[in-house]
């Protein structure tokens, strides 16, 4: 499987090199990104696409496309095809999450960034350390698909999302100066909404009588952090599989019985078996929290805000916050 993926990536990189060497005035296929004078922006992942759409809302002549399919979630297993990289090379700007989340695109992005086309949405954000082991604390080992020692899922916290939309607007303004003011104005409106959500999250930790939480995956760490909650354990970090050994499950269950966290947070569409078993063994309830890492291809403009508002209501209910 790894050999096949490597071959696919090498072939795609070769195609991309050919595309980059083509004359800048070479014709593009009808309907391809950048056709008919459009300023096409390619967003790598679903949350980055949501944020980029908000920045580009009602800006004439600008089209935002999504690179990784909307339902993919965390993209570390995604292998782009030659056709995918054709789309990428045709875009006028490429917006990435950054922090190594798009490791599968490292070589193509380096080639494209020679034209300053790549916009890193993580610039100016404050990433959390990557967790290591069941204690949920960062010890600097990082993700296979992220920057060393860093949790790359910054999109999952509204305060960081606000910084991301501002970084996107700044980068797009450099690529398309004629619309820089419109990008900046849209970003400030979106950032204000996200900062409002972050303030609501912070209120939970200020008033909750108990604050312990267990996370199914480390992307939920940003929600827990902004809510002022105390992460007792992280069941899965980075590319780790979701299966817990019986001995690890029993040890975690004993620990949770002793520490009595309020909630085990799983992820939609349903918690994995480890979450259900741990909840059953420890007596700690579980609920689903959505980081908006994936979603519908026709997501509404306020999709991110609605998802985060639902998360806030769930946390308020379990942490006894009115």
Q: In which residue ranges do the predicted regions lie?
A:
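General helical structural elements
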Residues: 8-9, 32
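Bacterial N-terminal signal peptides
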Residues: 10-23
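Extracytoplasmic metal-acquisition and chelation regions
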Residues: 2, 23-322
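Twin-arginine (Tat) signal peptide motif
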Residues: 3-7
């Amino acid at each position: 499987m790894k050999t096949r993926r490597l071959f696919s990536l090498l072939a795609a990189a070769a195609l991309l090199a050919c595309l980059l060497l083509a004359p800048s005035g070479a014709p593009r296929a009808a309907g391809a990104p950048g056709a008919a004078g459009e300023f096409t922006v390619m967003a790598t992942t679903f949350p980055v696409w949501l944020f980029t759409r908000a920045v580009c809302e009602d800006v004439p002549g600008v089209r935002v496309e999504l690179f990784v399919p909307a339902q993919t979630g965390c993209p570390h297993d995604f292998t782009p095809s030659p056709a995918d990289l054709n789309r990428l090379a045709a875009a006028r700007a490429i917006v990435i999450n950054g922090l190594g989340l798009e490791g599968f695109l490292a070589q193509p992005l380096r080639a494209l960034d020679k034209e300053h086309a790549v916009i890193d949405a993580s610039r100016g954000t404050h990433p959390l350390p990557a967790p290591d082991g069941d204690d949920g604390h960062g010890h600097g080992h990082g993700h296979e698909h992220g920057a060393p020692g860093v949790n790359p899922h910054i999109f999952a916290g509204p305060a960081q999302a606000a910084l991301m939309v501002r970084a996107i607007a700044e980068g797009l303004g450099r690529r398309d100066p004629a619309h820089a003011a419109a990008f900046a104005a849209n970003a400030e409106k979106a950032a204000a909404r996200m900062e409002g959500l972050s303030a609501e999250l912070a209120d939970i930790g200020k008033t909750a009588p108990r604050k312990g939480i267990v996370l199914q995956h480390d992307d939920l760490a940003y929600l827990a952090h902004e809510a002022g909650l105390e992460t007792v354990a992280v069941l899965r970090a980075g590319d780790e599989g979701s299966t817990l050994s019986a001995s690890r499950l029993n040890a975690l269950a004993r620990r949770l019985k002793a520490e009595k966290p309020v909630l085990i947070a799983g992820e939609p569409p349903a918690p994995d078996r480890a979450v259900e078993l741990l909840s059953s063994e420890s007596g700690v309830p579980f609920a689903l929290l959505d980081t908006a890492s994936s979603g519908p291809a026709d997501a509404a403009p306020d999709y991110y805000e609605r998802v985060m508002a639902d998360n806030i209501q769930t946390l308020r209910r379990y942490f006894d916050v009115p």
